[in-house]
C-alpha cells in the first residue's frame, strides 16, 4: 500500500497507479477549493451534460453493452439510458429548491436566535461502479455527486471493459473535466484511490467487496455508501393474480440475464397455487423469449462457471442447458431445491429461479426473516392486508407489491439496502443528501447579553436558567 504525504499539498510515491490516483485527487481537491463546483449553474450544466451524453451517444452505449453483456439496444435504453435521464431530469427540476437553506425554530433559551441548516458538498468523492448496469450505476451516483457540488472520480468496473472505455472517453467530453475524472482499472486502482482519503466513497457491488471497501475506508474515517446485493425474495400468495405475477416475475428475472441487483432471487409460492403458477411462469418465459436465442449470455467465464456450478445436482422444471463457448445459460426454473443447496445460499445473479412451496404467508415471512435483510422484497397478492404484512414485517431495502424492481425508477423514493444489502441511500433528493453534509447554522444577536448566562450563578440565576432550558 502506498501513502500520500499530505492531503493538500504534494504527493510522492513510486507506484504509477498510486501516483495517478494521488495526482488526480490532488488536482480535483485544488479545483474544489476554488469554489468552481458550487454555483447552481455549474451543477445544472453537469446534469444537462449527463443527459446529453446518454441520449446523443445512445448507439455507442448500446454497442458497448452488446459487447460486454450481450444486451439488446432496447434493454440498454430501458436499463441504462431512460433510468439515467429520469434521475438527471428530476435533479435538474428540484436542485434550486434543495440548495436553499431551511429555517428551523429554536428553543426558548436560544431566542431570538435564527437557526437553519444547509447542504454543503463533501469535497472530492469516489464513485465505484459495477458491471451489470455500467452506465446507470455510475452516472446515477454521479448525478447525486455533481448536484451536491462535489468534484468526483468515477471508477467503472473492469468487468465491463467496453462500457468503461466509453465512460472514460465521453465523460470528459460532456462534463467539466477539471472537476470530474474517470480512472479505469481493477481493485488495485480502487484501493489506491481510497488511500487518498476521499471525502466519500460510493460503492455499488457485491457484499463481500463492499466489506473490503468499508475496511479500506475505515482508517481514513471516509464515509461510505454501500449499494450491495442479496437474495431478494418474491412471495406469491393464493390471492395473487397468477398470470400478472408470472409475467412480471419473468420480466424481472429475464432482464439482463438475471444480473440485476433487484431481480427476483427466489420465489415463495403458496402450495395450493404453485402448480398453476409454475405453468403460467413457464408460458410467460417462453412467450417473452420468442425469437430470442434459447440461452442467455452472462457477463464472463467466471460468472458462467459459478452459475453452472449452482445448477449441479438440481432437477430443473424448465431449462437447465448451458453452453460454455457462448457463456450462455437457458433460463431455468427449479422447484423445491433443498434449502441448504448452494442455489438457496448466496445471491444467484443469473437466469436461475428457484420456487419454494410455502404453507402460508406466515411461513414465507418466517423464511425470509431467517436470512440477511434483502435489498428488495416482493409480494403478489390482491389482499391489502397481505401486502401490508410484507411492508411492515419484513426488514429490507425496499418492498414492492404486484411488480418487480419498479421502485428503482421513482426518484421520489429512497433507494438503498439495509444490513448486508447495504447502507445509505440515493436517488432523487436522497442522492443529493448522500453526497452532502447537513450543516447547522445558528445566528445569535449580540443583544440582549444577559448577565445570568455567565458564572458565577446566583440561586436566582440558576432557578431562571432551569425554567428557560
Ligand atoms: P463487485 O463487488 O465484484 O465489483 C464492483 C466494483 O468493485 C468494481 O468496480 C471492481 O473493480 C471493484 N472491486 C472489486 N474488488 C475490489 C477490491 N478488493 N477492492 C476494491 N475494489 C474492488 O460487484 P459486481 O460483480 O460488479 O456487481 C455485482 C454485485 O453488485 C451483485 O452482488 C449485485 O447485487 C450488486 N449490485 C448492487 C446494486 C445496488 O444498487 N444495490 C446494483 C447493482 C449491483
Predicted regions mapped to residue ranges:
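N-terminal Rossmann-like NAD(P)+-binding subdomain of aldehyde/semialdehyde dehydrogenases
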Residues: 1-116
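Conserved C-terminal structural/oligomerization subdomain of aldehyde/semialdehyde dehydrogenase
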Residues: 2-3, 7-9, 38-39, 235, ...
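Structural signal for hydrophobic packing residues in well-ordered secondary-structure cores
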Residues: 32, 36, 51-54, 58, ...
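Residues at or immediately preceding the N-termini of alpha-helices
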Residues: 21, 40, 58, 242, ...
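Residue-level signal for inorganic ion chemistry
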Residues: 43, 88, 149, 180, ...
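Rossmann-like NAD(P) dinucleotide-binding subdomain of oxidoreductase/dehydrogenase enzymes
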Residues: 107-244, 358
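ALDH superfamily catalytic-core signature
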Residues: 11, 15, 175, 208-338, ...
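Short loop/edge segments at beta-strand edges and connector loops
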Residues: 99, 184, 205, 318-320
Amino acid at each position: 500500500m502506498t501513502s500520500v504525504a499530505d492531503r493538500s499539498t504534494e504527493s510522492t510515491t513510486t507506484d504509477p497507479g498510486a501516483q495517478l490516483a494521488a495526482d488526480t485527487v490532488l488536482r480535483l481537491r485544488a479545483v474544489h477549493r476554488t469554489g468552481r463546483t458550487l454555483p447552481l449553474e455549474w451543477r445544472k450544466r453537469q446534469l444537462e451534460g449527463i443527459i446529453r451524453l446518454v441520449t446523443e451517444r445512445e448507439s455507442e452505449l448500446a454497442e458497448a453493452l452488446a459487447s460486454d453483456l450481450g444486451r439488446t439496444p432496447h434493454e440498454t435504453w430501458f436499463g441504462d439510458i431512460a433510468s439515467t435521464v429520469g434521475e438527471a431530469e428530476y435533479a435538474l427540476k428540484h436542485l434550486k429548491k434543495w440548495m436553499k437553506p431551511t429555517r428551523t425554530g429554536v428553543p426558548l433559551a436560544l431566542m431570538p436566535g435564527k437557526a437553519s441548516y444547509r447542504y454543503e458538498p463533501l469535497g472530492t468523492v469516489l464513485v465505484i461502479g459495477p458491471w451489470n448496469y455500467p452506465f446507470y450505476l455510475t452516472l446515477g451516483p454521479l448525478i447525486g455527486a455533481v448536484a451536491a457540488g462535489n468534484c468526483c472520480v468515477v471508477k467503472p468496473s473492469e468487468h465491463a471493459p467496453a462500457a468503461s472505455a466509453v465512460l472514460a472517453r465521453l465523460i470528459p467530453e460532456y462534463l467539466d473535466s477539471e472537476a470530474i475524472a474517470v480512472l479505469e482499472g481493477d481493485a488495485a486502482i480502487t484501493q489506491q484511490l481510497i488511500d487518498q482519503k476521499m471525502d466519500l466513497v460510493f460503492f455499488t457491488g457485491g457484499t463481500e467487496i463492499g466489506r473490503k471497501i468499508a475496511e479500506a475506508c475505515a482508517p481514513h474515517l471516509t464515509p461510505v455508501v454501500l449499494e450491495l446485493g442479496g437474495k431478494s425474495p418474491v412471495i406469491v400468495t393464493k390471492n395473487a393474480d397468477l398470470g400478472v405475477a408470472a409475467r412480471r416475475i419473468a420480466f424481472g428475472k429475464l432482464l439482463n440475464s438475471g444480473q440485476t441487483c433487484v431481480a427476483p432471487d427466489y420465489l415463495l409460492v403458496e402450495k395450493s397455487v404453485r402448480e398453476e403458477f409454475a405453468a403460467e411462469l413457464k408460458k410467460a418465459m417462453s412467450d417473452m423469449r420468442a425469437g430470442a436465442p434459447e440461452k442467455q449470455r452472462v457477463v464472463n467465464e467466471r460468472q458462467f462457471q459459478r452459475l453452472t456450478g449452482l445448477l449441479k445436482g438440481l432437477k430443473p422444471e424448465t431449462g437447465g442447458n448451458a453452453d460454455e463457448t457462448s457463456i450462455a445459460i437457458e433460463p431455468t426454473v427449479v422447484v423445491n431445491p433443498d434449502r441448504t443447496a448452494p442455489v438457496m445460499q448466496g445471491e444467484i445473479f443469473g437466469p436461475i429461479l428457484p420456487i419454494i412451496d410455502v404453507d402460508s404467508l406466515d411461513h414465507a415471512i418466517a423464511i425470509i426473516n431467517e436470512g440477511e435483510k434483502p435489498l428488495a422484497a416482493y409480494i403478489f397478492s390482491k389482499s391489502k392486508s397481505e401486502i401490508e404484512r410484507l411492508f411492515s414485517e419484513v426488514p429490507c431495502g425496499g418492498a414492492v407489491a404486484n411488480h418487480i424492481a419498479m421502485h428503482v425508477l421513482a426518484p421520489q423514493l429512497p433507494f438503498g439496502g439495509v444490513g448486508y444489502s447495504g447502507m445509505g441511500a440515493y436517488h432523487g433528493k436522497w442522492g443529493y443528501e448522500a453526497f452532502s453534509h447537513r450543516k447547522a447554522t445558528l445566528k445569535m444577536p449580540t443583544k440582549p447579553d444577559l448577565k445570568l448566562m455567565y458564572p458565577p450563578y446566583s440561586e436566582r440565576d440558576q432557578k431562571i436558567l432551569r425554567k428557560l432550558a
